[in-house]
A protein has these predicted regions:
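TPR-adjacent "capping" and linker segments in tetratricopeptide-repeat scaffold/adaptor proteins
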Residues: 1-13
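Short coil loop/turn residues that delineate tetratricopeptide repeat
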Residues: 9, 43, 77, 110, ...
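Conserved hydrophobic/aromatic "anchor" residues
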Residues: 14, 34, 48, 68, ...
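Structural signature of tandem alpha-helical TPR/SEL1-like repeats
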Residues: 23-36, 57-70, 89-103, 124-137, ...
């Protein structure tokens, strides 16, 4: 029994030393101490937890997850263990996913879904350039799949690259003629580039699929306002306001596409 107590005491000493080293930023040395602590006391939940924290700092996410789960298995009723695992997942989930997708691609470079999902994850992580690169690779590997093209177009729209988005969306609508969102996005891109007739044609395709969509009706109003077709703009704006006045009114406050109608009595009455 005394030998077991000695092992636990020695384990705690190594654990404490590991914490001090980790606080100083000496992560490799801290890892060694936590591993010694675990060798002396494999049931030390806090040693596994501390080991996981250092693995996460070193971006060894799989090792970190394993250590957190061991800690949780040792103390399933520990609120701290659950909390620390949740913190790890919330802080590192995207980086962890990126790392795993990259590993999948290293093992199988021509894996279109891995490139697609890596691109989407890069986008979620705020890395648009990396996202565009991976989505383009997914398109090259699976040119008949409209989904990565639409996702790439969405990124390009967010970046203000409407011309490139138009190219992708034309392919999406060719591959998937009943894709309402693609026709709507294509209309938005054409309108942003000043191609009003093309925008109207795209919106009409969308309208044939879902005529009462609020965003479609609103964008038609915006198109006609820019185009100088005031009567059509007001007609569609009234329809949009009838569907959801609060939402449409909030859109109008920050939408420069209706500047041509400002000062018009009928328009001002609608705002």
């Amino acid at each position: 029994m005394s030998r077991e107590k000695d092992s636990i005491a020695s384990s705690d000493e190594h654990n404490s030393r590991g914490i001090e080293l980790a606080d100083r930023g000496w992560l490799d040395e801290a890892l060694k101490e936590f591993k010694k602590a675990i060798d002396l006391d494999p049931n030390s939940s806090h040693a596994h937890d501390n080991l996981a924290t250092v693995f996460a700092e070193k971006k060894q996410f799989r090792d970190a997850l394993d250590a957190y789960l061991v800690s949780l298995r040792l103390e399933p009723d520990s609120a701290t263990a659950h909390y620390n695992l949740a913190c790890f997942l919330s802080a590192h989930a995207l980086d962890f996913a990126i790392s795993e997708y990259q590993t999948a691609i290293e093992l199988e470079p021509d894996y279109p879904d891995a490139h697609l999902n890596l691109g989407l994850t890069y986008a979620d992580a705020g890395k648009p350039e990396d996202a565009v690169k991976e989505l383009k690779t997914a398109i090259e590997l699976e040119p008949s799949d409209p989904f990565p093209r639409h996702e790439l177009a969405g990124l390009q729209m967010d970046e203000g690259d409407y011309r490139s988005a138009i190219t992708q969306l034309k392919d999406v609508t060719r591959l998937e003629p009943d894709n309402f969102e693609a026709w709507l996005d294509l209309g938005i891109c054409y309108a942003q580039k000043g191609f009003y007739a093309e925008a109207e044609r795209a919106y009409e395709k969308a309208k044939a699929l879902k005529s009462d969509d609020l965003l479609l009706v609103y964008n038609l109003a915006a198109l006609y306002a820019q185009w100088g077709r005031k009567a059509d703009a007001l007609e569609h704006l009234k329809l949009a306001l009838k569907v959801d006045r609060v939402k449409v009114s909030s859109w109008l406050k920050a939408d420069p596409m209706f500047e041509a109608l400002e000062g018009e009595a009928e328009f001002e009455a609608l705002r």
